[in-house]
Curated annotation (Swiss-Prot):
Protein name stated in the entry: Retrotransposon-like protein 1
Species the sequence originates in: Homo sapiens
SUPFAM superfamilies, per the entry: Acid proteases, DNA/RNA polymerases
Role summary: Plays an essential role in capillaries endothelial cells for the maintenance of feto-maternal interface and for development of the placenta.
Chain intervals with Basic and acidic residues compositional bias: 131-149, 1338-1347
UniProt xrefs under PANTHER family: LDOC1 RELATED (PTHR15503), RETROTRANSPOSON-LIKE PROTEIN 1 (PTHR15503:SF39)
Highest taxon, organism lineage: Eukaryota
Source taxonomy: Eukaryota, Metazoa, Chordata, Craniata, Vertebrata
Main location (coarse class): membrane
Keyword Magnesium set for record: no
């Protein structure tokens, strides 16, 4: 019987889709590699091949290397070799990708999809911001203060990109080393098996299964290294590997041969290209593991998205799959609101929507701390139901479904139920059924096209038994199913399965043969079938709007079915008895001017020009007009003399626009008239437009239908009453629609247009603006950040002529007074003008009035953009008293730019009662006034409000809090606010930001990870606003210090101690690349040279820390003579001189004692040659560590270029039962002297070994001395080198050499210091060790580094 199934949630939903079962994404695993043949150019990655190889690489430095290396997170450090690979279109990269330059060389030749995606990401993020800047440029006026130059901005961005590139390269290098470590582990296992069997196993044919790649490659490399004379060039080595390929891998290789690819003659590049196609790399494995377990948890959405986007480039999954995984890890609070808006059509849009919801929720939590009467009206607008919701089941994949009685294996499968959208379902894998099935109800809900079978078929299990009683009659066409980047077409049989929407049977498992992790419940696809057929980009969904035909030019496609709302001809056909023959407006030649005048007026003054026959004209219009003028005059008097603190019209008016990103402005046809007496007052117009003061209406009198109707204003408000103030603003002929996301905005615009069509209200298409991010409305420029005055208002104010009478002055004051909140210290500046207007004396215009008039116009010219206050962010309050007026400024910090953002200004004259206040009360008065005016933002804030005081006022507090000076009747009022005081920063030509701003910005920067700012810029498209408030100026030294601190904090967040023991920080990128890659490549290729043999031994030898060590194996040789022993003095460890570095080196090296008569180079063969250890008789002895001959050390001296001419009689003969000690003389010199017996006793008591064994006298007879090497052995010594040789320096750089300081800390030495210490040590050994190797007398120019032939190896080991 078929197991019950689960629900699914729809992730690619179009606007007209029905609701569907939806479910969370499940655990699963896939891959990103494709196996498609092709050719390319050779990459740089590969093992070192000598100086000639190094010369081919471009010059490298820290900066240049970072530009050359691919810097995608978790991506390989090496440039990929050319490989026949068909690139996949990756989704847009993360924010860090946008900061980097695309890789050059072979990376460009291959057309890297990551770079292309990055370019597309840049265009997507730059174009909206550029358009917004262009629109804002028309309303920007000149501002004083220092602005950042483009050079400074470019330099900052370049340094940030350089820092990000370094971080990503280090992480990429770490994961690439894990791949090499895995190959090394496989090589060790193969060597152990070969030693036990006596020979290396023959490599099996590789068919392309990625699970067998490591074993195949390592075995081929070991075999090739065992026969260097047979495979002496790269073409033969490549041919050997191709001869052991089959299936898909052979097809890939044949494609290279047919295209005559240069990879055939380059073995390292061939291996790298093969690795790109067939290797399941550690970076991909870790990224998939992280993607399956990533959850938001208690973090912010920004941090969660940062981590999510860091995994996107390396995974390369389709966009719809990434959307499903991103939604899966979100907190339930964000998901609750996310699924109430239409589904975004891309991952970038979804990220923007999530960030907006998080910000809106933070603002909501801050507003809920206010009393109910102080909360904004639109607080619950996000809770409004949406017609299309994301139907998501209530249980997560990690939880237990109530209808499932046991654990199952599920895959997150994106099923494309039709060509237009996909649905995410949890597909059951371990059902036991033989075929693939889909739930009948699920197919009906998603309108899946079904077909009838010619005859019914029973449902069978894997053993052939029948499941259920009803046969299968229906089936689907092949549907595209995507699991991460594994896509295929599956035909489903339709069965009733209420709990499981999709079931994958045994036939599916047989075809794909996935690797199943039953503990974690995941599947990974490695089979050749999947590499060949499944790992390719899925076909894109068909966008319906792309095929829509717009009936009117300029009308967006989503509204093409509503063209009759804009089409004049259709409007005439429906509303006029005499339609126009040419489809134009049925207007006379004299009417357009009147219509244009009505359209240009924000206040709809055409009401009083209407014919007297208008049915809605009020009675006694002239009397009401006179009353209106008299009331306006006295209202102006009251406003100018008012001394009370009330909530401001601005910014309260624009609270409902917080979070709005998209705007559409519709221009209504006809004439909109206002019946209200006070309808012409500016602030009343604003209240009506924003829905704050609406008339109570249950119906309206129908207006005459015509192409140019006359409609009362209250009728338009009645039509839009349930939308006004929530996502619509309307006054006169302008209707502004605003939304938080683009998908939601499409739905809101359609709602308005449908409502207008129903009420026969028509719009002008030529004057309408669709889908903008900056729009002008009622004299304001509205942006997602805030609001400012538009160009028309600024032109009227700044171009107003000098008043010549009180009437002219009153008109000027009456016009500018509603916009007073855009000017800092408005009451102080306009005080002479107001005094002149309110005086009973004859009008007089003097110098003081002229200066105030000009100063007021300059203040409006410099009026900044007022940002939307964010209650969830900290506030700064700047207040003061000047003369007879007080002023206050509400300030916050812009999250994106880190600069000062003005939210509101307030000023008023001091009342006669307040003049009698004491000096302390007068200083606190503006603070109290600001708290009263902005109480809806400042009351019960989570973080303290920072009150900025000047040095004099701050000193007057005497280190006491402000509450100490509060009068008794103000204490209760101030108890509602969380505030603190700080010194006001100095203002030298501009407004410097408070010092705490940098702390706040750094704290936010660290909390939201290093990429927060870049993420917001890339996702939201916000530009760096060049028109911030005038006079802004940054302290250059403070900015440089902050930048350095940010870099240090960013580097501190990298776990350097977990990445190669923190030594990467001391080297450049080129050195890291050369040391690590070449070093490990040398280990994997098993070069038969003595130097690399010594390095291999040093890496693999470990000290035995047990109390009773197991006996070691030793080669049996004749009894030796006396040899050298080295015992370390304790002062060598406790000292801090350069020589102490030798101790750290020797703790990783075997003891310097006599061992056996095997020559030094044969000793290397002993450790390298597989299966040759059994040729020597071994017996156990007491554990002393690994034994080496003096010849071994002499060979090491020769390799490092340390040579000393021995002098006769210079070195005394060693006496029996004596030891040699290593001592420090002065600060740099090292000498050997004979150890005294009491010294040895002291060493044994202290337990000083450090890896060098001090043996007792009774065991000295077991030592052996090295015999002269056989003259018949044809040996080739390594080429002598100098200690400053680059390869020697690389060797020293790969070893961690430290000095113990007095406090016990380790300090890393430089390579030059280590080379100097090593030179002294090897010189010492060279003088003491005898005999000289036989090959030392040979001409030095004939010695070179090369592989030993087979016959030489056999001769040395016989």
């Amino acid at each position: 019987m078929i197991e019950p199934s689960e629900d699914s949630f729809e992730t690619m939903m179009e606007h007209k889709n029905p609701s569907s079962k939806q479910m969370e994404s499940s655990e699963g695993s896939s891959n990103t590699t494709e196996a498609t043949s092709g050719s390319g150019v050779r990459g740089e990655a590969g093992p070192a091949s000598g100086p000639a190889q190094e010369k081919k690489e471009p010059p490298s430095g820290p900066l240049q290397e970072m530009e050359e290396l691919p810097t995608d997170l978790l991506q390989d450090m090496e440039e990929p070799s050319s490989g026949p690979r068909k690139e996949i279109e990756d989704p847009p990269n993360d924010l860090l990708q946008d900061l980097e330059e695309s890789c050059n060389g072979s990376h460009q030749a291959r057309g890297d999809p990551l770079s292309g995606a990055s370019d597309r990401m840049k265009e997507a993020s730059v174009n909206p911001s550029g358009a917004r800047e262009e629109q804002e440029a028309h309303t920007d006026l000149k501002e004083s203060g220092r602005e950042e130059t483009p050079q400074e901005q470019n330099q900052t961005e370049h340094s940030t990109a350089e820092l990000m590139a370094m971080v990503r390269s280090i992480i990429s290098l770490y994961f690439r080393m894990q791949d090499l470590k895995e190959q090394q582990r496989v090589a060790e296992e193969i060597l152990i098996k070969g030693i036990n069997a006596g020979q290396l196993p023959a490599p099996k044919h590789f068919s392309g299964d990625r699970r067998e790649f490591h074993e195949f490659i390592v075995l081929c490399q070991l075999t090739l290294q065992s026969y260097p004379r047979m495979f002496y060039n790269d073409r033969l080595r490549v041919g050997y590997v191709i001869n052991h390929l089959s299936g898909l891998a052979l097809e890939w290789a044949k494609a290279l041969l047919q295209e005559n690819s240069p990879l055939i003659g380059d073995f390292p590049a061939f291996l790298e290209a093969m690795s790109e196609v067939f290797e399941y790399r550690q970076a991909l494995r870790v990224a998939e593991e992280a993607m399956f377990t990533i959850r938001q948890g208690g973090r912010s959405a920004t941090e969660y998205i940062d981590e999510f986007q860091s995994l996107v480039p390396i995974l390369g999954w389709p966009d719809e799959v990434l959307q499903a995984h991103l939604c899966q890890g979100l907190n339930e609070e964000i998901r609750h609101y996310l699924f109430r808006v239409p589904q975004p059509d891309s991952l970038d849009s979804l990220i923007v929507l999530i960030l907006q919801i998080e910000e809106k929720l933070a603002e909501r939590r801050a507003m809920l701390r206010l009393p109910p009467e102080a909360r904004p009206r639109n607080l619950t607008w996000i809770d409004s139901p949406a017609p299309e919701r994301w139907m998501v089941s209530s249980w997560l994949p990690s939880e237990v479904h109530p209808d499932i009685n046991r654990a199952h294996l599920f895959l997150l499968l994106m099923v494309r139920v039709n060509p237009y959208h996909s649905v995410a379902v949890q597909a059951l894998v371990d059902s036991g059924a033989d075929g693939n099935f889909m739930d009948e109800k699920f197919a009906q809900e998603h309108y899946v096209e079904l077909y009838e079978k010619p005859y019914p078929q029973p449902v069978q299990s894997v053993d052939g038994s029948l499941i259920g009683n009803e046969p299968v009659w229906l089936y689907t066409e092949p549907l595209v199913c995507i699991h991460q980047n594994h896509q295929e077409s599956i035909e489903f049989d339709i069965v009733p399965s209420p709990n499981f929407s999709v079931v994958l049977g045994i036939r599916w498992l047989r075809v794909h043969a996935p690797e199943v992790d039953w503990i974690k419940g995941r599947c990974t696809f490695h089979s050749p079938y999947c590499l060949k057929n499944c790992f390719r980009p899925p076909p894109p969904c068909i966008a319906l709007e792309r095929h829509g035909m717009s009936l009117l030019p300029g009308l967006p496609h989503p509204y093409s079915d509503l063209a009759d709302v804009f089409n004049p001809k259709e409007a005439d056909d429906e509303t006029s008895d005499q339609p126009s023959s040419d489809g134009s407006d049925d207007l006379s030649e004299s009417e357009p001017s009147e219509l244009q005048q009505a359209g240009d007026s924000d206040h709809s003054e055409t009401f009083y020009e209407c014919p007297s026959t208008a049915p809605w004209e009020p009675v006694g219009a002239r009397m009401q007009e006179r009353a209106r003028l008299q009331e306006e005059y006295w209202d102006l008097q009251d406003m100018l003399t008012n001394r009370q603190d009330y909530i401001q019209m601005i910014p309260e008016l624009f609270d409902q626009l917080h979070g709005a990103e998209w705007f559409t402005k519709l221009e209504l046809r006809g004439t909109i008239v206002e019946e209200s007496v006070n309808g012409h007052r500016t602030e009343d117009v604003w209240k009506a437009a924003f829905g704050l003061e609406l008339e109570e209406m249950k119906s309206y009198q129908p207006f005459a239908l015509s192409p140019d109707p006359i409609i009362p204003q209250n009728v338009i408000h009645f039509i839009l009453k349930d939308m006004l103030g929530f996502f619509v603003l309307s006054y006169g002929q302008e209707v502004l629609i605003y939304s938080m996301s683009q998908e939601e905005h499409l739905h809101h615009v359609r709602q308005v247009l449908v409502r207008f069509r129903h009420h026969n209200v028509y719009c002008s298409l030529d004057k309408s603006q669709f889908h903008r991010q900056t729009v002008e409305f009622l004299g304001f420029v509205v942006t997602p950040k805030g609001v400012k005055l538009n160009k028309n208002v600024m032109t009227i104010i700044t171009g107003y002529p000098t008043p010549g009478s009180k009437l002219s002055l009153r008109n000027f004051i009456e016009f500018v007074f509603p916009y007073r909140h855009f000017v800092e210290r408005f009451s102080i500046i306009a005080e002479p003008l107001v005094r002149q207007l309110l005086s009973s004396y004859q009008f007089y215009w003097g110098v003081e009035e002229q200066e105030a008039f000009e100063c007021l116009k300059r203040a409006f010219r410099k009026a900044p953009l007022l940002h939307h206050p964010k209650p969830q962010n900290p506030f700064y309050l700047e207040t003061g008293v000047t003369g007879t007026a007080l002023h206050a400024s509400l300030i916050q910090i812009d999250d994106q730019t880190g600069k000062r953002a003005c939210c509101a200004f307030y000023s008023r004259n001091i009342s006669p009662i307040e003049v009698e206040y004491s000096q302390a009360e007068m200083k606190i008065l503006p603070i109290r006034a600001a708290f009263m005016v902005w109480c809806r933002y400042l009351e019960n804030t989570e973080e303290p409000i920072m009150i900025l005081l000047n040095t004099e006022d701050l000193a007057s507090l005497n280190n006491d809090r402000l509450t100490v000076l509060l009068p008794g009747h103000w204490v209760f009022f101030f108890s509602h606010f969380n505030f603190d005081v700080m010194e006001l920063p100095e203002q030298d030509g501009g407004r410097a930001l408070p010092p705490v701003r940098n702390l706040r910005w750094r704290r936010a920067f660290q909390r939201n990870t290093a990429a927060r700012q870049t993420l917001l810029l890339a996702s939201r498209g916000f530009p760096r606003d060049p028109s911030t408030e005038s006079g802004e100026e940054e302290n250059e030294e403070q900015d440089e210090l902050n930048e350095q601190i940010l870099r240090q904090e960013l580097l501190a967040m990298i776990p350097i101690d977990q990445i190669l023991n923190s030594f990467l920080a001391h080297f450049s990128m080129a050195q890291i690349r050369a040391v690590i890659l070449h070093f490990f490549r040398g280990l994997l290729y098993w070069k038969n040279t003595l130097a690399l043999a010594a390095i291999l031994v040093l890496l693999r030898v470990r000290q035995c820390l047990s109390l009773r060590p197991a006996p070691a194996m030793r080669v049996a040789r004749p009894q030796p003579q006396r040899s050298l022993r080295l015992i370390l003095d304790s002062s060598l460890i406790a000292g801090s001189s350069i020589t102490t570095a030798i101790t750290q080196l020797l703790t990783q090296m075997p003891a310097l004692v006599g061992a056996n008569t095997i020559p030094a180079q044969e000793l290397a063969e002993l450790f390298l040659g597989p299966g040759r250890w059994q040729r020597n008789a071994l017996h156990s002895q007491a554990h002393r560590g690994l034994q080496f001959t003096p010849g071994f050390w002499l060979t090491l001296c020769e390799f490092f270029g340390v040579r000393v001419t021995p002098q006769e009689g210079h070195l005394p003969a060693l006496r029996q039962n004596r030891y040699l000690e290593l001592h420090v003389v002065g600060d740099e010199d090292v000498v050997l002297r004979e150890a005294l017996q009491d010294d040895l006793q002291r060493y044994r008591q202290c337990g000083l070994h450090d890896g060098l064994q001090d043996t007792s006298q009774d065991k000295q007879d077991n030592d052996v001395q090295e015999a002269p090497p056989s003259h018949t052995a044809a040996t080739h010594p390594p080429r002598p080198r100098h200690l400053m040789d680059p390869q020697v320096l690389e060797f020293l750089g790969s070893r961690l050499l430290h000095i113990h300081s007095a406090d016990g800390q380790l300090h890393l030495l430089s390579r030059e210091q280590a080379a100097r210490a090593l030179s002294q040590f090897l010189t010492l050994i060279y003088r003491r060790a005898l005999p000289i190797p036989a090959w030392e007398s040979q001409p030095r120019e004939q010695a070179r580094l090369e592989e030993l032939p087979d016959e030489d190896e056999d001769a040395n080991l016989d």
